[in-house]
UniProtKB/Swiss-Prot annotation:
Binds 1 zinc ion per subunit. It comes from Rickettsia massiliae (strain Mtu5). InterPro entries: DNA_glyclase/AP_lyase_DNA-bd, DNA_glyclase_Znf_dom_DNA_BS, Formamido-pyr_DNA_Glyclase, FPG_cat, MutM-like_N-ter, Ribosomal_uS13-like_H2TH, Znf_DNA_glyclase/AP_lyase, Znf_FPG/IleRS. DNA binds at residues 92, 111, 153. This is Formamidopyrimidine-DNA glycosylase.
Amino acid sequence: MPELPEVETLKNSLKDKLIGLIVENVELKRDNLRYKLSPLLATEILNTNILDVRRRAKYLIIDFNNDYSLIVHLGMSGRFTLQSANYKTQKHDHVIFDLSNGEKLIFNDTRRFGMIYSFKTDLLEQEFFNDLGIEPFSDLLTLEYLKDKLQTRKRPIKNLIMDNRVIVGVGNIYASESLHLARIHPDKSGSDLRDDEIENLIKSIRDVLTKAITAGGTTLKDFVNGDNKPGYFTQQLTVYGKEGQSCLSCSSTIIKTKHSGRSTFYCKTCQYRLASFTI
């Protein structure tokens, strides 16, 4: 599933190309993706100018000059790409936006776990994103903030940093990578982290996400940016997907476990932990 770096990469690839264009037509090829598509989607943004393209958590947001915004979640296999006027529709193209420069913005989703909504722009934070935590790069992500969120929670730290009510956008890949960089065992209880570990974890999350964005995200299978190009952070992964391989830091063996049904990868030496944790 695309995480924060992939959506940030998508935003960066589309923003300058879309701002100022008008949506001249919206074609819904089906009436549902993960959830039912609103029939109003085709009318609420019709003949409107694109003012901005931005990101919140793992959502791509396109703002229009009629005070509506388009909210896009890629799900497991979604692709949101800009195509030329002579583009031939593909099998899993579900929503097509015809733009005033002749190009088409295509939402393609093989597994149909993606989501597209239109929503009043000024109500997004209060109503649509009201349950989301803070952004990893926000100045609000401080030792005090994260310590307060962790100190009463006995859950494994990996689960906690993937909880969008705590920090948004840190999915499975980047949680494993960040914890390895911070040398924190993924099973360690959030409430057991020392202040220096919390500060190091915040820095590690930001460092990993920054490198991933610079590399254009991680493409394991489906992700491409708005120009239909894959991400290359896969080549920089240190533990994720490396089960049985040697740790690049200490040469110990990378271990694979499960947290809430998700694969977790860590180094048994760099991320050594005395006590066990029952999940």
